[in-house]
Amino acid sequence: MEHASLVAFLEGKLAPEQFGDEVGAEVSACNQAFRSKGLGYIVVSDGPCTIVTRDHAKRLLEAVADQRLTFQIANYAADCIIMSDDFEFADDAVNEAIYFVEDDSVAPTLEEVRAAIEQLSR
């Protein structure tokens, strides 16, 4: 994933659908490799240090809630944010929201996503 594309999406300069189109094949390849070999690679290019804000996290969650971005793509984006040295969280609420999206053990329900969005509004 290109750092610049992820930041553009988080900042609202790239629509969720455009972001999904741009990274969809990469996400599918990673998920397929994980299913078939038990190992998938998450890669994000280097970029300037970016502080992930509550607005950024809300944009990611709202894209999932509004079905403008699949959970799989949002999950991959969250993995990229967490694994990259070029992203930092503005506060604990942002940290929790990104880790919520990163947890792919069970896809969250719409109610859980809405509750996570609400937490960022406090």
Regions found by a protein language model. Name each.
Residues 1-122:
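Acidic, Ser/Pro/Thr-rich low-complexity regulatory regions
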